[in-house]
A protein has these predicted regions:
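Glycine-rich anion/phosphate-binding loop at the beta-strand->alpha-helix junction
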Residues: 207-210, 239-331
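Short glycine/threonine-rich loop-to-helix capping motif typified by GTGT followed
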Residues: 198-202, 245-255, 282-294, 321-331, ...
Length: 464
């Protein structure tokens, strides 16, 4: 292909800025066009190759394609089995199984197309015997399984360990020491995002969270897991919630891979991580609920362009309806449209080399690394959780964002902007859509997930 730009003189960043300033006719360039994000990043009106001193380097571990996942809660094994098989027949490429108790493995996976659809688990209990049963079952199958064991994630959500710190880690050591190449450990960062943390905080906490595992198991288990092929065996799965700040969220996932690669290299393990992404709950609403479709679509787009391995969409009515065929089908079809009709799977790493996103990736990574180092100097992530410092920082960020919403500066269409006074939801609530309080004794203060619109919605429901 011929060079279409060879007949045109190149324009430097300085020349662009001079032209913009002339067009502003006296208005201040910085005050008019440069804005500051919640993360403290000054976003410029344009980005240019002159902004970069070094050539772009590829983000480590980016996938060449991505998978459409369907979430299924296991209550009745036969129903879960039917839902999984039906979802795969209708376009799902992976299944995320959630369970609160042990289940009949053979019933859930009866006639399951193992080679066709990878399996992710989200188990809210921790049993060595049950994990062993699962591993034995899948050892005879040609499939990919992600067990997603996250002891610290459970601690941040519930305020307690499954058993206690020592016993939980001992069980995990035993599982890891079985010398398998399966994906065992996960780092669930969704609670940080849904709790109101900034993107920089999410990245720093994700890194510190992962570092607790790597540091604990460095001398105890990793050598046994890795054997002679140390750079290939261990891979951590990150669960990521994606918010509405489109370009920042693309950069967030890229920065996470970049940061993890740097951390993993220090432990001499594989620099590749696996990322499963899902839309945030924080900006979802009860009223004018169809807008949730628009929100989740752009959030899934951010996850795809950012380089997530798997996307598990959130149904538009997930806040107030129990899982239902219509909502699940629509959420799956959103991803199918992005993949099959919008061709979001035909170009790998589409964001690479885009000046704005590359700049955001670098700035977010730098700021997150600074915060990570501060956490480590303070005794590490677990110590900071124990002292309540992480929880306090997330609260402060959440309160600032809540204030922006309350003042109308952060707009949620149909809720605090262009509301429909005729909209009624009181009789349509199958689920309680607000923060649930469950008084109990905890060893740390749990991180509470809360939506921005909760107070507004509660007031509207009272008036119906």
């Amino acid at each position: 292909m011929s060079d279409l730009f060879k007949d045109f003189d190149s324009v430097s960043a300085k020349e662009w800025k001079q032209k913009i300033q002339a067009d502003l006719k006296g208005a201040d360039y910085n005050e008019t066009l440069v804005w500051q994000s919640r993360e403290g990043i000054h976003v410029k009106p344009f980005y240019h190759p002159d902004d970069f001193e070094e050539a772009f380097t590829p983000i480590p571990g980016q996938p060449t394609t991505w998978h459409i996942a369907q979430h299924i809660f296991i209550d009745d094994e036969a129903i879960a089995n039917n839902l999984a098989i039906d979802a795969i027949e209708r376009g799902a490429e992976a299944i995320v199984f959630e369970a609160e108790n042990e289940f009949d493995i053979y019933k859930v996976f009866k006639k399951y197309p193992f080679e066709k659809a990878p399996i992710y688990f989200n188990l809210t209990f921790f049993s060595k015997d049950f994990i062993t049963k699962l591993k034995q079952f899948f050892s005879e199958k040609k499939t990919t399984v992600f067990y997603n064991i996250d002891l610290i994630g459970n601690l941040t959500r519930s305020g307690n360990w499954f058993h206690n710190l020592k016993e939980d880690h001992k069980i995990l050591e035993n599982i890891l020491s079985e010398n398998s190449s399966e994906a065992i450990i996960s780092v669930d960062t969704t609670g940080y995002q849904n709790g109101g943390a900034t993107i920089v905080q999410q990245l720093a906490y994700a890194l510190a969270h992962a570092n607790e595992y790597l540091n604990h198991f460095d001398n105890v288990t990793l050598s046994a897991v890795e054997g002679s092929n140390s750079q290939q065996s261990l891979e951590i799965t990150f669960k990521v919630a994606v918010g509405s700040n489109y370009f920042f969220e693309i950069a967030k996932i890229r920065a996470l891979r970049k940061l993890y690669a740097a951390l993993a290299s220090e432990y001499k393990i594989s620099e590749t991580c696996h990322i499963i992404a899902m839309p945030s709950k924080r900006n979802k609403t009860l009223y004018d609920y169809n807008v949730n479709l628009l929100r989740t679509t752009t959030e899934c787009m951010s996850a795809i362009l950012g380089g997530a391995d798997t996307i598990c969409n959130l149904p538009y009515d997930a806040l107030y309806h129990k899982s239902n065929e219509f909502g699940e089908r629509i959420s799956r079809n959103q991803l199918l449209v992005l993949k099959e009709e919008s061709y979001f799977d035909t170009v790998s790493n589409a964001a690479d080399g885009t000046y704005y996103i590359e700049s955001l990736t670098d700035e977010l990574a730098e700021k997150a690394l600074e915060l990570f180092k501060t956490i480590e100097k303070g005794g590490g992530f677990l110590q900071q959780l124990k002292e309540g410092k992480v929880q306090q920082k997330i609260k402060e960020s959440a309160e600032k964002e809540q204030q922006l919403y309350n003042e109308g500066k952060l707009k949620l269409l149909g809720t605090n902007y262009h509301t429909n006074p005729e909209d009624r939801m009181k009789d349509d609530l199958d689920l309680y859509p607000f923060v649930k309080t469950k008084p109990r004794k905890t060893i740390i203060e749990p991180i509470i997930e809360k939506r921005l619109a909760e107070q507004t919605e509660q007031e509207r429901l009272k008036q119906e």
